[in-house]
Amino acid sequence: MKRKERRINKDYGYNRKCVCHYEASQKRFCYSQYSCASVLYERVRDIAKIIDRLDSGLDAWCLRDAIISVLRATHCVPRVDRMLGRWYLKTSVFYDFCPDDLILSCPNVIMPNVLNFVKKYRDFIRSVLYKVSVSWKNQYMPGVLAASRFLEEISNSLNGVEESIPCIYLRMCATLTEIVLRIGYLREIYQENPYVMFEELAFSLFTQKWVLPFSCMTNLGLVEKANSTVFDVAIYNTCLYSLVDFTIVNGEHLFPALLNGSNISMNLTRYQQEAKNIFEILLSQIRVVERDTDKTVQLTVYVEVWHVSALMWLDLYEALPQTSRVTFCLIIPGIFMDRYELKRAQWSLFHKNIAFELGKCDEITFSTKYLEFERTTDHAKITMSSFIEKICLCLKGGRMGLIFRKNVYQYSMIPHVPLYCGGDFLDVLPVRDGINTCMRMLLNVVHFLGDEVSDELTEEIDFVRLQCKFFMFNELRRVVRKMVLVANAVIDYAVENKDFLCEGIEDGRSLGICVTGLHSVFMTVGLSYAHPDARRLYRMICEHIYYTCVRTSVDCCMKGAEPCNLFDRSKYALGMLYFDHFDNVECTLPEELWTTLRKDVLMHGVRNIHFTAGTAMQKEFDIINSSESFWPMEDNKILRRSNIKVVIGKDGLNDVTSVYSSELKSLYIPVYNNLLLNRFNKHQQYLKTVGYRVLNVDTNLFTDKELDDLAVFKDGFSYHLNDLIEMYKSGLPFLDQGQANVFYFNDTVSLRLLLPLLYKAGFKVAMYKVLCNSEMYKHLDLSNPLPLIGKCSDGVVMHVKNIL
């Protein structure tokens, strides 16, 4: 039956055209009439009807106009966002193109072995996709903002047809299943027939139990493209490169990595005079990529604090605009921390050749060499107090990280590697001259909460009780095992297809299981962040992930895979496990499991060299409807499309003045937390006026249960610094890479006192994000409407960001 043609009724709504409808382009659609919160509730159905009248063939980005308007009433954002998401993705679920039909119609785009797999199992694939789509549409379909970010980051066109989310997941599942079935050691460990394997992968991806990086979802299974990659992070150690060498590397690796949306990390300290020019080149390339593509990229610059150029970089950091996607990361040696608290101490800064020699030293000889050069060579000096004050000022800006070099060396599984880089996006990995990367995957721990357990399971090993819920460790171990196999399948795929970043992963085959949803688990079961059970749960999660990763990696070698190239140089070859670096480590898993694992590692080796990370994957976690690993809120939504209309709200309902520009400027997007919104829906206006501070609320307005819940949210997540450190410390023995350390503090907390605590506790990456209470609320009056997109907002705005 022929589908009825749908057209836009431009006069719908208030029976008049708004400003944007006078433009020739039909890709714009305005809902600014519904900007006021009081009208929004009454008009939600009208909005749905208007969206229903959109021609499904139109550019779906027009729905962003609607979101810009409805975000003015942030207390109903989750509901409206999901409603718009349904319409936004309406054509994605068996509407215009069945995913398998679209895949099979593109033999010039999809790899032949993937096409053959889809052909062979086509009927079964259709039944699985139909079954999983029901659950996806009812529970896991993302809102319009998350969905738009998902699709714009991937932005594949299959012979002129935009790839839908189900089509992306089908391509991923088919490719991964085909790889596992073809590679012997993976097939033997997985021990599932292709039907079970495909179905399990489909349910995991559709329900966001775990998530692959956007670059992997973009390129996996497609016919080889020039300069494409499945890895989302790349570290470049350019210390030995000349300016000419850098130009070559930039053309062959750096710029292509940016075009793939990868997070780039570089040590630019030692260029000195050329550094500023190189930095400007990289910033201009970031602007080009973000202007001409839909990719979101990030640059991390490493700065060695013993180099004389460090002061220049800190000054440059302060001058960067707040909207810049650049993070600085200071590499700090042990001798710096030894002088940290000494009164009147001075710090020496060396010029290029001397600083380069120091950088080549391992941490054992670094201090000796530093003192020798301090006595015998010309150098600059700065008082420690002035230097630290400058560092803390940058840290308060929220885009500065620290790496404690001594802790990296002390706790690394690969000893005596002279050059290290790491940071907030990629974790601490050994880097030789050149490139290094990692296969990261996001694990959403919310999925392991259950309401009941089997009598056959053992408490404390297979599950733990959390208030009225159970956290299922047996299921977590099963899922993590499959994730390690999938990660190895992707790495093998990259090597096989000559991924242009594969040279950075071949030696260590590093993978990172990144935890997210932890805070959502705490809030769901009613645990406060400072509760001992919360810290214990996090430690157990890290322990089970690390054990399962190493166990699976060893099993790969037992089934015929070769140990990674770095195995013989690692401490694994000596029979060590990562937590052996720490004293008095509490392990929940039985000792016999660890003993057997050690023996097997010595006998067979490990396929991978790094496994677990506390770092959340910033871009990917936004689609999973959960919290970051330690940060309780959804991240700032980024709207960058050039055809977005910025609505300037003014007093009065009928004023729908709109301003267009080629680039989106000065658009404030609020951050909201679903759990807080749902539990305190009727109290939002009141809570906003008291700044969400528990001690300031009128207890007569709340029930006892609501007061208990409010205590869990802890003054709008303003946790005590000691609680944060104790939480982070609990997982350290099982995190062999970096950890996402988010510190939200008030003015009474000194960052100067925080750094020694982190250093002595054994943190390798000291900072990930620092949010200062006064900085976050400096320009916001919580008792008045917030200046977000217009003048109206009465939602939970914990943090806002000015976005280009």
From Swiss-Prot:
PROSITE patterns xref list: RIBORED_LARGE
Pfam families registered for this protein in UniProt: Ribonuc_red_lgC (PF02867)
Superkingdom to which the source organism belongs: Viruses
Biological process annotations from GO: deoxyribonucleotide biosynthetic process
KW Hydrolase (keyword) present: no
SUPFAM superfamilies: PFL-like glycyl radical enzymes (SSF51998)
Gene Ontology MF terms in the entry: ATP binding; ribonucleoside-diphosphate reductase activity, thioredoxin disulfide as acceptor
Keywords: Host cytoplasm, Late protein, Virion
Compartment(s) of residence: Virion; Host cytoplasm
Cellular component, GO, one term: host cell cytoplasm
Function: Does not possess a ribonucleotide reductase activity. Betaherpesviruses probably use another strategy to expand the dNTP pool in a quiescent host cell.
Family recorded in the similarity comment: Belongs to the ribonucleoside diphosphate reductase large chain family.
Protein name: Ribonucleoside-diphosphate reductase large subunit-like protein
Gene source species: Human herpesvirus 6A (strain Uganda-1102)
UniProt gene name: RIR1
